[in-house]
C-alpha cells in the first residue's frame, strides 16, 4: 500500500518545493523504496503549453507527450523515473474534466460544486495508479492562502481522513528570514503560515525551514512549540551552492529519517548515497572550465531553459569540468557584430524557441560557429536556423526561410501537416488550435551509420522527446547534402529530418528533438557529454 507525502509551501513562493520533493524522492529511493512524484498546479490553464516561457518558465515534455510543469524535470533528474501525463494536473484540466462529465450527464442531474465534485476529482487524480509504489510525494503548487489553491488544500485535507490511518503526512516548506537590523532570524512568518494551514484543517507533521544561515536550537524549539510539531521534525533547509547538494544536505539534517519515523517505519533501511556523493565531489573539484554561449530569446528568465542548463552541467560532470554559461539575447546580433560576443567562447548552443523575433541572430550564431570551427549545438529551432543558414550561404538559396515567419518562396522550414504517432496518422493545419497540437513526446529516429551522432549514441536506433510544430523541409535535403550538410538522422519512415551535421567540422550537430529532457546528473545525456568534451578541446586551442 502506498504512503502519501503532501508538500505545501508558505510565506513566499519560489522556496523550492519542487527541489525538496525531488530530493526527498531521491533519498527514499536510496533506501530501496519505489517512489512516485506528482504535482498539483492551481492555475486555470489546461497545461502550460501555451503559456509564455518568460512567465511560467520551461515546459517539460514527458515521453507520452504531456506538456507539464518544470518541476517534473526536477523529479526525473533526481529520481531517474520518467514522469507521465498522469503526474501533473492543473485547475484548468480538473474543471475541463468536470464540465465534460456534466455535459455527458455523468452527474445524473446533481448540482456540480467545488465540494464534493472538484475535490473528488483531485483526490481521484492523487490516488489512482499507485499500487506499484511505496511512496507518493505530492507537491501542491503556490502558497498557503492563495485563493487558487483552496480546492487542492481541501482535497488533501480530506485525503488525510480518507486514507488508512498512518498512510499520509504533511510537510510544510517555509521561510525563516534574517533581519539585518535586528541581527536575528525571525520565526513569526513561519508561525503565521502554519496557523493559516491549520485553519484549513491541515496540521503539518514536518516543518522544512529555508534559511540562509544556521537556525539556533532555541529558535527550533520555539517553532516546535508554537507550530505544534516535534522538535526533531523542525528541519533546517539551508542554502547550498548547487541543487545536487540538496539530497545529502537534507539527509544530514534528518529529513528522510523523520519522514519514515512519521510513518512508523523504524528501523529504516540504510541509504546508499555513493552516487550522489560522487556527483557532489565532481561539482566541488572540477579539473577545468569551459564557456558555452547560449544564444536564445527568453534569456530574461533562466527558468525558460531549466533542463538545458542542467543538461550542460551534467555534460560538465561527465568531463570533470565546470561549465560557465554566457547568456546572449539573439536579437543583439541583428544590430551588432557577433564576433566580440562569440570569439572567446568554447561552444555555441542555440536552443528551441518560437516566432520570428531573434531568428536572424540565431542564424548568424550558426554561421559564426560553422565558419570559425566552434562547436555548435542546435536544438529544435536551433537546428532549423542552422539549416536555413546552410541554405542561404552554402546552397545559394538567398530567400531561404521558415513559413513560421510568413509566406516565403523558399520554405526550407515548414509546418508539419502530418506525421505518424504509434500506428495512427496525426494531422494539423494552420487554422488549428495552439494548445496540445504540436508533435509532442517520444518518437524514434534512425541514425545514419558512420556519422558523428551515431558514434556518440553508440547505436543507430534512438528515441527522443519532441515539442515542435515546424520541421525542416525534406525536399531540400539533396541540395543541402551536396553542400556538405549531412542529414544524419531521419524519422523511421524517412519523411521528417531529425538530425544534421557537418562531417568536416570539429562538432556541429543540430537535432529536432530536445535531448536535455532526458539528461540526468547520474546519467548525463551522451550528446551533452560529447558537446562539452568538444568545448574542452576547443578551449585548448583558444
Swiss-Prot record:
Which residues bind UTP per the record? 13, 186-191, 222
> Anything known on activity regulation?
Allosterically activated by GTP, when glutamine is the substrate; GTP has no effect on the reaction when ammonia is the substrate. The allosteric effector GTP functions by stabilizing the protein conformation that binds the tetrahedral intermediate(s) formed during glutamine hydrolysis. Inhibited by the product CTP, via allosteric rather than competitive inhibition.
Q: Where is the Glutamine amidotransferase type-1 domain?
A: 291-541
Molecular function as annotated in GO: ATP binding; CTP synthase activity; glutaminase activity; identical protein binding; metal ion binding
Q: What does this protein do?
A: Catalyzes the ATP-dependent amination of UTP to CTP with either L-glutamine or ammonia as the source of nitrogen. Regulates intracellular CTP levels through interactions with the four ribonucleotide triphosphates.
Per UniProt, subunit arrangement is:
Homotetramer.
* Protein name from the UniProt record: CTP synthase
Naturally occurring in which organism (per UniProt): Agrobacterium fabrum (strain C58 / ATCC 33970)
> Mind giving the lineage of the organism this protein is from?
Bacteria, Pseudomonadati, Pseudomonadota, Alphaproteobacteria, Hyphomicrobiales
